[in-house]
């Protein structure tokens, strides 16, 4: 399944947020979208998901597997979210329900889109948690979000987005809210799992080295417009061929690298990852009540 966007324009009130966006995400490709704050990159992801603010005006086409999403009913969009297109948000602390056990949250898309119940549902929850390399999946399933670490919460969020086997995953700054020592582990996991499954990835960030590490192709957005759409190798090897905005982003990344080099430090996105349970990712306190045991997969 592929995503095709043609001449997409979005207005919020009088503000023209996205201006003539045209792009393709072929089946199985990893595409990075980079831009500064306010460039419109996150608004693009919300437009694809049909989650724009009330009152937004949209013109153009967003075509998913031959289906037009602009103007589609909420019912039709809801049937696509999670089952075919999923989104991983920036901060798992806000994207997860703080009052619901994590196992129950993973169960939601499995029930809704795959119709699983009983033992089949419990097995699917365990598989989803194991796939994202969480230690002691049974404990994680019966825990509330505040009882596990930030890195573990983001892994749970990844498990939720992939639970119903979508064909496209949109990841909007998925590691920004994490401690730098955990970021690489989560990025490696996201890249590995999506490539193994053949899932298309739309990876949104302001950090060029991270985008270049995750993507096959890089799209630069500036002031609501696409200024560059190039293979990732061009960003590394031929920056002089890029637009002024892309060169500015590349220059800032090189300057930051030189600062880290001068002070003898390692850039956060280049730090070695930590295996589950090693220093760098707190495991959180285990949920221990018998009530947790009974309710983990209800």
Regions found by a protein language model. Give the residues of each.
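Conserved ABC transporter NBD signature motif
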Residues: 57-68
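C-terminal boundary and immediately downstream tail of ABC-type ATPase nucleotide-binding domains
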Residues: 87, 237-274, 297
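Hydrophobic anchor residue at the start of the ABC signature
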Residues: 106, 158, 169, 182, ...
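A short, proline-enriched helix->beta-strand linker immediately N-terminal to the Walker B motif
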Residues: 163-167
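A short, surface-exposed alpha-helical micro-motif characterized by mixed small hydrophobic
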Residues: 211-213
């Amino acid at each position: 399944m592929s995503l095709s966007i043609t001449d997409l324009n979005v207005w919020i009130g009088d503000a023209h947020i996205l201006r003539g966006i045209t792009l393709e995400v072929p089946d199985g490709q990893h595409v990075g979208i980079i831009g500064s704050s306010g460039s419109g990159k996150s608004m693009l992801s919300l437009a694809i998901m049909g989650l724009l603010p009330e009152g937004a005006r949209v013109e153009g086409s967003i075509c998913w597997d031959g289906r037009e999403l602009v103007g589609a009913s909420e019912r039709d969009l809801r049937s696509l979210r999670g089952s075919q297109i999923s989104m991983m948000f920036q901060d798992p602390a806000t994207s997860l329900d703080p009052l619901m056990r994590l196992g129950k949250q993973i169960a939601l898309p499995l029930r809704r889109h795959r119709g699983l119940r009983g033992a089949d549902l419990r097995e699917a929850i365990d598989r989803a948690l194991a796939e994202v390399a969480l230690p002691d999946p049974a404990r994680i399933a019966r825990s509330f979000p505040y009882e596990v670490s930030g890195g573990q919460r983001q892994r749970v969020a990844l498990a939720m987005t992939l639970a119903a086997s979508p064909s496209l995953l949109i990841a909007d700054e998925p590691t920004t809210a994490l401690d730098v020592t955990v970021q690489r582990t989560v990025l490696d996991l996201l890249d590995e799992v999506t490539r193994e499954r053949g899932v298309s990835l739309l990876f949104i960030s302001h950090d060029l080295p991270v985008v270049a590490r995750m993507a096959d192709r890089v799209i630069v957005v500036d002031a609501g417009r696409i200024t560059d759409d190039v293979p990732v190798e061009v960003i590394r090897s031929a920056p002089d061929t890029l637009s002024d905005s892309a060169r500015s982003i590349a220059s800032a990344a090189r300057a930051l690298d030189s600062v880290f080099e001068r002070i003898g430090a390692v850039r956060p996105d280049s730090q070695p990852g930590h295996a589950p349970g090693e220093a760098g990712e707190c495991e959180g306190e285990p949920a221990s009540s018998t009530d947790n045991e009974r309710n983990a997969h209800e």
